[in-house]
A protein has these predicted regions:
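Glycan-processing catalytic domains of CAZymes
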Residues: 1-285
Length: 285
């Protein structure tokens, strides 16, 4: 703990960056960064983005700011990535709030007459990821609901995987109804052994880092720089040719320090250092 504090680490409950973004330590409300992200993602041919609302927070203010930027380019004829949401905790309530605050917001519709052109559609309706049995009739009628699918939980053909642990690189990692190959997830790294990336970064555990391939973490010099884990999964996805490849993730620079776990005094769940993180947004260094 004292060593952590001495190098500038924060207390439990505080949020920490695992690395420095290419555009510096920006705030999520920075519309200049939004424009640069839009440029990069559009140039890369990304079809749609999914907002992470899995913790029951909708980020509606940020989404509205992003919509204002996206809409400018839509009007100028740019084929911008479309937008969707992923829910999990309190999924039914969260989906309804997203519908009310964003999709069915009268003020937004008046301000942006072509707003519906920004939504990512699947099977003829805007797509949302959630727990369908929790959805009310309005949400079920408006959206195509793909089932929230956690890597350490069971799967369903209509699932939309956040990432894969044990099912990775197997037929179970291919999701679709009525024989379709609808979606495969590709992620940059997976905290598959401990659900605490800090455990592998600093305490000798064996989560799947960015350097993981052929069933183990590659410890050779600079292995992290080659994206072995990502490439192995992407090769699998390309070989199986699904209708969607869902990549986890983008813009995940910050994690909250958690309470100690056994002899691990410094604990982070979703990201800890460059090798134990899953953000493919460019960074400095």
């Amino acid at each position: 703990e004292s060593n952590w504090q001495n190098i500038g680490g924060g207390a439990r409950g505080e949020h920490h960056f695992w690395g420095e973004p290419l555009f510096g330590y920006y705030r999520s409300s920075d519309t200049w960064v939004m424009r640069k992200h839009l440029q990069m993602l559009t140039d890369a041919g990304v079809d749609f983005l999914v907002f992470d609302a899995t913790n029951a927070y909708t980020y509606s203010d940020r989404v509205k700011e992003l919509i204002s930027v996206w809409y400018e380019y839509l009007k100028d004829g740019v084929n911008v990535p479309k937008l969707a949401f992923y829910t999990n905790t309190s999924s039914g309530d969260t989906m309804r709030r997203i519908y009310d605050e964003i999709y069915n917001n009268a003020a937004l519709k008046k301000q942006y007459p072509r707003l519906d052109e920004l939504w990512f559609n699947w099977n003829g309706k805007p797509m949302i990821v959630g727990i369908s049995k929790e959805a009310d009739s309005t949400v079920k009628s408006y959206f195509t609901i793909k089932e929230s699918t956690w890597p350490n939980a069971g799967r369903t053909d209509n699932g939309f995987p956040w990432m894969e642990f044990g099912r990775s690189l197997t037929a179970e990692a291919i999701y679709g109804v009525n024989g379709r190959k609808e979606v495969i997830n590709v992620s940059l790294a997976q905290h598959s052994a401990t659900c605490r990336f800090s455990a592998t970064a600093w305490y000798g555990a064996n989560d799947r880092t960015r350097s993981w391939h052929n069933g183990k973490n590659d410890t050779s010099a600079n292995a992290m720089l080659y994206g072995y884990n990502f490439a192995e999964q992407f090769d699998f996805a390309i070989k199986n040719d699904p209708e969607m490849i869902f990549i986890t993730g983008f813009n995940e620079w910050v994690a909250q320090r958690q309470k100690p776990w056994g002899n691990e005094s410094i604990v982070f769940v979703d990201c800890a250092d460059p090798n134990n993180s899953r953000d493919f947004e460019p960074m400095k260094g």
